[in-house]
């Protein structure tokens, strides 16, 4: 599992109570302005778009994947990847894999890089970009089944429990599939579809061109498959066989995709037969406008319409005036110049902020797709007409900049960028949802039940669907997926356009990206209520819970301890041997993964008095506790601790008193396991005998991520240290003066910076908190350093430069 990324870098502090503050440079959502001609740092935007594609990676992740909260997915309990075709990208906010959108997206990404390679390389993003393209290309290659046949869809597209009915993170999705279906392999289909085969041929031809000099053997394999797939697509000339894509991606035309593929195969091979095929077979069948002999210039580039992409490629290759004029019509149509130029009017609407809004469903993907074509046309087929080139280029820039905040809402529709962004995002893994209840995500309130509203992760670089045709972005919910979803095809043309923007305006990627996120909530947790009590016993009903999201995961060896004091038992003349610990009812039956063995009492060695013992609840296989649903994320066990009512006929009255028991604190007042008052930090949970939740009676506390190998740093003695601003430091990093250094100190710093009227740090606390050695007082940089210390990334405070 690629869990070690969790400790590979350090993030900005995630605040308690939802407080928003300015964080260290590069860790915020703020998009830095470019010092040169452009309005924004387009290299940063491109860098973050690559991050989004890495979030979408399925299967065993490559070492270069930089997403700190992602891990391997679609693997069985033995660690084997089980999809019939491994790897590839998840399509959108779900976990389907479609060869169609993988091929289309990788092709548009490749096109952008190939046209603006020097600029992307100069920005230092070339290797990262090619890594991500190759991930998509290799999936397409593996999906080829020969003679034009392709694996079309991988995912739960049959039966009642389909992919879209499941809301959980990618890392645990296959466990939910297994729970529902009893196996570890997702369904797939093999289809004969000209669109899928042709787009696959196109991107494999591009792969040959991209990698023929650095990996000639792999490049030749790409080209061989590209030729075969093109032959199959041309032979089928049909798009009706869509298999599991039905209702999601209903392909409709083939000639555009075959022409697009033929152009790329010609560029890859120089074989004129591909141009001959275009002229003899595809141009005569090229789509036309309704009730007109004009070639179709309306609508726009998308996964089901590569008409204009094919036309632009053909115009570039041949230089034929009629095709150059055709592209001119298409761009003017998008600029809504129809009435003045003898063209059909734009089918959508131009918003007050200048967005050419084609349709409510992913409007920004359509606008940025066309922006890429317009910028490329300006740089190639229109380059000798400076007025036209500048005009079209300016329009294209406006569509891209609209996404970053030059719009009616002053909102960035690119996540993780800008001061204001949409709050409801249709993306399962980014949400970190553990109980399959997602309706309140991004809303102000979780309702009476307190459902999760906060996202676990920032989905940096993802282009969201966008506003309505008035330029308004309403109070959308996650279910309004036309506006709130993200997808690999949404980012494709946008990313290609960014390559052109970097070519025009330059830019620099962030040096400290991506940040590692600090968990926003406890990943492992215990809750308990009183299930029954009497003069001689206490019966507890407890939940062991898995709310992991950094990354989402399961663990096999899980146990927890309930601590109790035996002093009154001993005072009554009884011995520890008279105490009985026994299991009662529980969620899983004997022999099942989630079944627990209840045992004890065991002496707790951390109590010098010798009076603290504990009952242990150990699960047969804790992987049953998985963050995939309302019943799966927790495992309920009821257990009783008791003494005999009488021994040798003598009552034991007074021998049992739970009021001084470490774990009993709060239990008597807890009302419901579903409510916050039942959360019990004095019942400690362990993974592989490592403390992951709670506090032991001797004060030992769990460390976030301990089950991933993150260990607490040793405390540095600082009693006589001087702060950079003068004065004695009692303990470096201890901003709240509780004698410890942990995340609470970082949180207090950020809260104080955000709301100093409400959150106070004493003068002594400020001395302790100034750990970044910059001599600038207490800043967000100090919180940043404290996090690194808590995560074990630095060994002492203050930080040494």
Q: Can you say where each PLM-predicted feature lies in the sequence?
A:
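Terminal connector regions
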Residues: 606, 610-613, 625-627, 631-712
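Aromatic (Trp/Tyr) and acidic
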Residues: 36-51, 55-112, 153-199, 203, ...
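Aromatic-lined, polymer-binding surfaces characteristic
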Residues: 197, 201-211, 219-267, 298-315
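Sec-dependent N-terminal signal peptides of Gram-positive bacterial secreted proteins and lipoproteins
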Residues: 3-25
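Low-complexity, acidic Ser/Thr/Pro/Gly-rich terminal tails and inter-domain linkers that flank the onset
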Residues: 506-537
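Cellulosome-associated attachment modules in secreted, modular CAZymes
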Residues: 19-26, 711-801
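Short beta-strand elements of extracellular/lumenal beta-sandwich folds
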Residues: 534-566
């Amino acid at each position: 599992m690629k869990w070690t990324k969790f400790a590979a870098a350090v993030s900005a502090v995630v605040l308690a109570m939802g407080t928003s503050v300015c964080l260290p440079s590069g860790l915020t959502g703020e998009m830095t302005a470019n010092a040169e001609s452009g309005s924004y740092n387009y290299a940063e935007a491109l860098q973050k778009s690559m991050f989004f594609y890495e979030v979408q990676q399925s299967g065993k992740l490559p070492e270069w994947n930089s997403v700190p909260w992602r891990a391997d997915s679609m693997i069985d309990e033995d660690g084997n990847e089980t999809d019939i075709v491994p790897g590839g990208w998840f399509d959108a906010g779900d976990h389907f894999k479609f060869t169609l959108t993988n091929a289309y997206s990788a092709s548009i990404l490749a096109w952008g890089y190939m046209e603006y390679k020097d600029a992307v390389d100069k920005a230092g993003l070339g290797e990262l970009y090619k890594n991500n393209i190759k991930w998509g290309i290799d999936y397409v290659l593996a999906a080829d089944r020969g003679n034009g046949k392709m694996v079309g869809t991988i995912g739960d597209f049959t039966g009642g429990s389909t992919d879209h009915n499941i809301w959980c993170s990618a890392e645990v999705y296959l466990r939910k599939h297994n729970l529902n279906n009893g196996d570890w392999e997702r369904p797939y289909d093999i289809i004969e579809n000209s669109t899928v085969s042709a787009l696959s041929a196109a991107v494999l031809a591009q792969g040959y061109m991209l990698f023929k000099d650095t990996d000639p053997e792999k490049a030749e394999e790409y080209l061989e498959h590209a030729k075969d797939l093109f032959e199959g697509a041309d032979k089928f000339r049909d798009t009706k066989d869509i298999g599991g894509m039905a209702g999601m991606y209903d392909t409709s035309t083939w000639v555009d995709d075959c022409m697009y593929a033929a152009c790329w195969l010609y560029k890859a091979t120089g074989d004129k037969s591909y141009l001959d095929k275009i002229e003899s077979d595809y141009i005569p069948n090229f789509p036309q406008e309704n009730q007109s002999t004009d070639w179709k210039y309306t609508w726009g580039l998308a996964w089901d319409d590569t008409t204009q992409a094919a036309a632009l490629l053909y115009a570039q290759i041949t230089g034929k005036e009629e095709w150059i004029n055709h592209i001119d019509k298409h761009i003017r149509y998008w600029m809504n110049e129809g009435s003045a130029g003898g063209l059909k009017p734009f089918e959508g609407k131009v918003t007050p902020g200048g967005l050419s809004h084609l349709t409510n469903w992913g409007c920004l993907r359509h606008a940025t797709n066309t922006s890429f074509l317009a910028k490329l046309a300006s740089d190639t087929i229109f380059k000798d007409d400076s007025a036209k080139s500048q005009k079209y280029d300016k329009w294209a820039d406006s569509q891209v900049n609209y996404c970053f905040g030059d719009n009616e809402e002053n909102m960035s529709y690119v996540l993780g960028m800008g001061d204001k962004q949409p709050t409801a995002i249709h993306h399962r893994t980014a949400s970190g949802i553990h109980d399959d209840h997602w309706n309140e995500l991004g809303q102000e309130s979780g309702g009476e039940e307190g459902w999760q509203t906060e996202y676990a992760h920032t989905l940096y670089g993802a282009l969201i669907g966008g506003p309505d045709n008035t330029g308004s972005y309403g109070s959308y919910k996650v279910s309004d997926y036309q506006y709130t979803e993200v997808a690999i095809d949404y980012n494709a043309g946008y990313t290609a356009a960014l390559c052109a923007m970097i070519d025009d305006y330059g830019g620099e990627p962030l040096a400290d990206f991506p940040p590692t996120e600090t968990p926003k909530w406890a990943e492992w947790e215990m809750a308990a209520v009183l299930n029954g009590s009497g003069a001689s016993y206490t019966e507890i009903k407890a939940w062991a819970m898995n709310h992991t999201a950094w990354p989402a995961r399961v663990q096999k060896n899980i146990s927890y301890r309930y601590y109790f004091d035996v002093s009154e038992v001993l005072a009554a003349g009884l011995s520890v041997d008279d105490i009985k610990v026994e299991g009662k009812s529980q969620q899983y039956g004997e022999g099942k993964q989630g079944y627990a063995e209840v045992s004890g009492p065991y002496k707790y060695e951390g109590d010098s008095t010798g009076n603290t013992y504990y009952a242990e609840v150990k699960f047969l296989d804790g992987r049953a506790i998985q963050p995939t649903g309302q019943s799966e994320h927790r495992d309920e066990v009821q257990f009783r601790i008791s003494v005999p009512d009488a021994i040798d006929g003598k009552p034991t009255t007074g021998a049992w008193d739970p009021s001084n028991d470490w774990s009993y604190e709060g239990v008597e007042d807890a009302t419901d396991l579903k409510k916050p008052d039942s959360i019990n930090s004095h019942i400690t949970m362990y993974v592989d005998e490592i403390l992951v939740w709670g506090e032991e009676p001797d004060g030992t506390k769990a460390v976030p991520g301990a089950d991933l190998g993150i260990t607490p740093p040793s405390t540095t003695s600082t009693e006589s240290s001087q702060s950079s601003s003068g004065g004695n430091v009692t303990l470096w990093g201890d901003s709240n003066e509780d004698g410890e250094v942990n995340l609470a100190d970082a949180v207090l710093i950020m809260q104080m910076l955000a709301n100093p009227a409400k959150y106070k740090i004493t003068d002594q606390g400020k001395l302790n908190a100034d750990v970044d050695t910059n001599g600038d007082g207490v800043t967000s940089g100090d919180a940043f350093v404290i996090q690194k210390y808590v995560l074990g990334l630095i060994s002492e405070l203050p930080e040494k430069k």
